[in-house]
Amino acid sequence: MNKTIMALAIMMASFAANASVLPETPVPFKSGTGAIDNDTVYIGLGSAGTAWYKLDTQAKDKKWTALAAFPGGPREQATSAFIDGNLYVFGGIGKNSEGLTQVFNDVHKYNPKTNSWVKLMSHAPMGMAGHVTFVHNGKAYVTGGVNQNIFNGYFEDLNEAGKDSTAIDKINAHYFDKKAEDYFFNKFLLSFDPSTQQWSYAGESPWYGTAGAAVVNKGDKTWLINGEAKPGLRTDAVFELDFTGNNLKWNKLDPVSSPDGVAGGFAGISNDSLIFAGGAGFKGSRENYQNGKNYAHEGLKKSYSTDIHLWHNGKWDKSGELSQGRAYGVSLPWNNSLLIIGGETAGGKAVTDSVLISVKDNKVTVQN
C-alpha cells in the first residue's frame, strides 16, 4: 500500500514538473506583442500576422481562442497595454498602402466585450518601433525606438534597389556605418491619455534612447534593460525611471549582460526580485565599435542568451539559465512570476512554448 502511494506521488510530481506552463501558441510566435488583464492573456501580431488570441489562465481547460483580426495589417515590434478594460496597440513595423515597409505611429483599441477593433484618431509625435510601453496611473508611457525617418528611408532605398545585390550591399554599408548618436533613437518619454487620446511630453532620458529594450514596472518605478544603441550594436545599460513624488527621476543601475548586451530580452518581478533573462546580440560588437568600427556587427553571428540575472543587493547576479537561448517573445507578469510566451531561438526560429521564471529566497525556478 505504502509503495503504491509512493509510486503515485512520484508520478504526480513528475507530471507537475513536466506540465506545460501554458498550451502551445496556435502558431510559432515571435516579434509580436501581448498583455494580461484579469488573468486573461492576449497575444498577437508578429509572426501571427494580423491574428490575435486570448487564453484564460484560470480556466480548467486552458486553450487559446482566436479574436477579431487586427485591422491595421501585419505588424512587428508593436507594443500593447490594458487600460480600464481595453487593449491599446501602439505602432509597429509593417507595409503601408503602397507595399513599402514603414514604421507606424498610430494607435488601435480593442474592446474585449464586443470583440472589436477601432483605429483611434491619434498619432504619436514620432514613430513607434523598437519602443517600450508601460502603464502608470491610468496612462500609457512610451519611450525608446528607432527614428522613423531614418528607418523608413532605409527601406525605401532597399525597395528601389530591388534585387541588385551590389546596390543592396552599398545601402547596408551606408546604413550601418554610422555612430550610435547619428541614428537618433528616441530618448523622449511620451504619455498617452486614453480618456482624451492625446499625447504629451513626459520627460527625456539624460543618456540615450534604445530599441528593443526589456521593460518592467512596479509601483512608481520602471526599469529599461539593455536593447540596441544603434542597429546591430547592443548596450548593457540599465535605466530606472522613478515616478515617486512630483518629479520624474532617471537613474542608471549597474550594467548587465556585459560587455555586449542584448536586445529582445525578458524582464519581470517575482517576490520583489527584478529578473532579466534571455535576449540576442553579437559577441564582439562592442569591442569592434570601441575600436572605431561603426558597422560593429559586420560578419558576426547573432547569439541567443540563456542567462537569467537577478538584481540583488545593488548588483546583478547570474542566478540561473533558460533551457535554450531565446529572444523577441512576450514577457508578462503572472502568478508573482515572469511569464515568457514564444520568442525565437538560434537561427531566428519562432517557438510555440512558454516559460515561467519564479524567485524565492534568491533562488530561481524555471518551468517550461
From Swiss-Prot:
- Which InterPro entries does this chain map to? Kelch-typ_b-propeller, NANM, NanM_proteobact
Catalyses: N-acetyl-alpha-neuraminate = N-acetyl-beta-neuraminate
Q: Which GO terms describe its molecular function?
A: racemase and epimerase activity, acting on carbohydrates and derivatives
Keyword annotations from UniProtKB, A to Z: Carbohydrate metabolism, Isomerase, Kelch repeat, Periplasm, Repeat, Signal
List the EC numbers from the record.
Answer: 5.1.3.24
Per the UniProt record, one Pfam family is NANM
Q: Where are the Kelch repeats?
A: 40-84, 86-137, 139-173, 174-219, 222-265, 287-336, 338-367
Signal sequence range: 1-19
Catalytic center at which residues?
Answer: E228 (proton acceptor)
Source organism, top-level taxon: Bacteria
**Compartments, as annotated in UniProt:** Periplasm
Family to which this protein belongs: Belongs to the NanM family.
PANTHER family, alphabetized? KELCH-LIKE PROTEIN 32, LD33804P
Described purpose of this protein according to its UniProt entry: Converts alpha-N-acetylneuranimic acid (Neu5Ac) to the beta-anomer, accelerating the equilibrium between the alpha- and beta-anomers. Probably facilitates sialidase-negative bacteria to compete successfully for limited amounts of extracellular Neu5Ac, which is likely taken up in the beta-anomer. In addition, the rapid removal of sialic acid from solution might be advantageous to the bacterium to damp down host responses.
How is the quaternary structure described?
Homodimer.
Name used for this protein in its record: N-acetylneuraminate epimerase
Gene encoding it? nanM
